Amino acid sequence: GNTRTRENVIRRQLRIFPGDVYNQERIARSYREVMMLNFFANAAPNVLPVSEDKVDISFNVEEKPAGQANANMGYTQSIGMTGGGGLALPNFRGRGQSLSISFSANANQGSSYSYNYNPNRSKYRSLSISFTDPMVNDTKNLLGGSLFYQYRGGGSMYYSPINYTIAGANVMWGRIFKWPDDYFRGTWQFQMTRRINDADSPEELQQYAGGLEQSDGISFSQTIRRDSRDHPEFSTIGSHFSFKSMISGWILGGQENFQKHILNLEWYTPTFWKFVLMNSMKIGFV
């Protein structure tokens, strides 16, 4: 039933293979893994006896729309009218890869003769693009990266009057674990950012940016998570645990020195009929 998703993207999620001993638990796990891709409305397994000691197992998948396009508008007193859009393709080219692009800007981009121009409001624009391959060459390795850019002009309304530009990039590697079980996976990310500050006077630069015309942030983060939910969107059973630690500066270099640690716990308990109790806890410190 896969009309868009490539065959290998589905097969690499399966936990039972030709020649294996029949195992209901592994069939159920295969169904769960295919559904967690979030590319299919259904992936029901079908067991067909072919002899006294053999059966054929097929997974009848039903593709559903996975990509998203969005447009947005907003208004704030400091920036004014903003607009933007984005494109998210979680199943890019049917290979299970993820590609996303987003941008936004405000209307205060023209000269003082522009209808939308207000000298008290900040100019603003941002752009980001990211790509992730969750199973490179059908292995248990994840590779990804992103580029991002943001500019905000100075304005006297509520916020800092200096102009600043932030640009950066990151690369990420991940791996599915075998221990304690294969619900665990880890990702490691290295990120570099640069902020350029532009002020009208040294006094403003000192007051709002600590006297720095340019600052670099170099960080490394690790995320360990375990996800045993039965569905990525409307989970009815299972749990999701993640612990992320980030360190910036110090031995890595740059002018931004901090540590950040976040623990997130979610677990789902079926109650009665179609009602599910979801409990969550989130703890973090910087």
Regions found by a protein language model. Give the residues of each.
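PPIase-associated folding chaperone regions across multiple families
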Residues: 75, 253-255
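Glycine- and acidic
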Residues: 12-16, 68-69, 247
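Active-site-adjacent structural elements in folded domains
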Residues: 226-229, 247-252
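Gram-negative/organellar outer-membrane beta-barrel architecture
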Residues: 6, 20-233, 239-242
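N-terminal periplasmic "start-of-domain" segments of outer-membrane beta-barrel proteins
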Residues: 4-19
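Transmembrane beta-barrel strand/turn architecture of Gram-negative outer membrane proteins
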Residues: 165-174, 241-249, 256-286
